[in-house]
């Protein structure tokens, strides 16, 4: 199953034809047509049709870029959402309030049937869960160890977790994530690594703070995240740049790969006076993969 490019994943309200039309020119790697939080209760059913029509119309132009965030599996909307939006052109489902990997397996079985009905090749529709939005989910993060069908990445969220536990804020007085959310961030990274998929960082809420977003993305990439959720169209380009390796990083990575290719039996090498061993080779290959 091929990897999707997930540096930037932009939410677009699925009930807004104007915003959907405008999103087609956005540089985000993935557009997430949102049926959950950004759509009012009274408009959810209609938004399904709007989303499905948009996917069908844009299938060729936006190939492998269209996801839908459905409503949580334990709501009355989830199955109807899936039945409406699994059409040719859909690349993936973002699953909010995922409780454990068991939810991914359940969703995957549903997608098996819906792909067959829609004439879509088996396994086409991938899944990105939001894996930290409830206390139960936090305690089940170890369930993502190993290969999971359709899993394309794992992301995390702070807002719903705050509401569940009754936190007044998810930041300390100095503006840093408080310990619970630092844990959620770290568990997302570890779960994604254990599952062999990219970890996608949560959104930067202040869409006017471009400098803060860029700094947060750079720090996130240093920690191991491969992309970030965007809540505003202007964030996509900033996110893409931050999660893409620089020319200097690519050149250094290529030197490491070339050095080991020239001496395949070596356990460690010296480059510019620095000892380089197999973990450095792994990181170099990952860096080159990011630019592919």
Regions found by a protein language model. Name each.
Residues 1-292:
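Expand to "…catalyze enediolate/carbanion chemistry for C-C bond making/breaking, isomerization
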């Amino acid at each position: 199953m091929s990897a999707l490019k997930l540096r930037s994943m932009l939410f677009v309200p699925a009930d807004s034809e104007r915003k959907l039309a405008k999103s087609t020119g956005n540089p985000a790697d993935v557009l997430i047509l949102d049926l959950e939080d950004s759509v009012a209760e009274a408009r959810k059913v209609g938004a399904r049709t709007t989303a499905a029509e948009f996917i069908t119309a844009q299938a060729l132009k936006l190939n492998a870029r269209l996801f839908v965030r459905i409503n949580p599996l334990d709501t009355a909307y989830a199955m109807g959402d899936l039945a409406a939006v699994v059409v040719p052109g859909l690349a993936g489902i973002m699953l909010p309030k995922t409780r454990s990997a068991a939810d991914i397996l359940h969703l995957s079985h549903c997608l098996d049937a819906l792909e067959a009905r829609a004439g879509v090749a088996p396994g086409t529709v991938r899944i990105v869960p939001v894996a930290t939005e409830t206390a139960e989910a936090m305690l089940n993060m170890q369930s993502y160890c190993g290969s999971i069908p359709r899993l394309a990445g794992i992301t995390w969220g702070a807002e719903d977790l705050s509401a569940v536990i009754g936190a007044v804020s998810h930041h300390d007085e100095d503006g840093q994530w408080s310990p619970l959310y630092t844990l959620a961030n770290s568990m997302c990274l570890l779960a994604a690594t254990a599952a062999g998929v990219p970890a996608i960082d949560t959104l930067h809420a202040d869409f006017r703070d471009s400098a803060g977003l860029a700094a947060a993305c750079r720090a996130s990439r240093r920690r191991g995240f491969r992309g970030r959720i965007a809540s505003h169209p202007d964030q996509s380009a900033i996110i893409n740049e931050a999660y893409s390796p620089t020319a200097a990083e690519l050149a250094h990575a290529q030197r490491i790969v070339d050095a080991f290719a020239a001496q395949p039996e070596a356990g460690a090498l010296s480059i510019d006076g620095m000892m380089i061993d197999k973990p450095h080779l792994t990181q170099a290959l990952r860096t080159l993969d990011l630019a592919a």
